[in-house]
Amino acid sequence: MKELEILLNRRWILKSEDKELYYRVRDAVGEIRKYVTDKLGCQIIDNSLLIKLEKIPVIPEQFMGIGQFSSKEEYVYLCILLMFLEDKDAQEQFILSQLTEYMTAVMPGEITDWTLYNNRRKLIRVLRYTVEQGMVRVTDGTDDVFMDDALSLIHIS
């Protein structure tokens, strides 16, 4: 059950970052799945890219937020970014203009003005968070360039 402890302590196990651990946990998922479903009420998500124990709290607490985020808009941007990534294949590249066009099209309420520094800064915080979490990789350019109103190339992990 060492693998269960690993799943409890980590957000996810990415195959691209640790193949040995990914396959070790994947081999044990059959035993773990029944236990966590029956006893903990959790689900295990496993696919060709990652293994994750879905740990959703019954009552959310203040400390459970994302420390880098300072506004509700950043959480909205993250959700829309995740929607955008769902339509992409692993390792597929995109440029920030594609993302901002998508976000503008699906954003609830008023249209986001990407010429405003504050809006670009919030998106950069979200992108930096997704890079830290291994969801995307920057392959060309920097996020600082985007804040100065230019384009960068992003790579989906």
Residue ranges and their predicted role:
Residues A28, L116-Y129:
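Short amphipathic alpha-helical interaction segments
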Residues K2-L8, K88-I95:
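Short capping segments at the starts of secondary-structure elements
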Residues E17, I59-I66, A105-K122, G141-M147:
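A cross-kingdom feature marking solvent-exposed beta-strand/loop segments within repeated
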Residues E73-Q93:
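Positively charged, polyanion-binding regions of nucleic-acid-associated proteins
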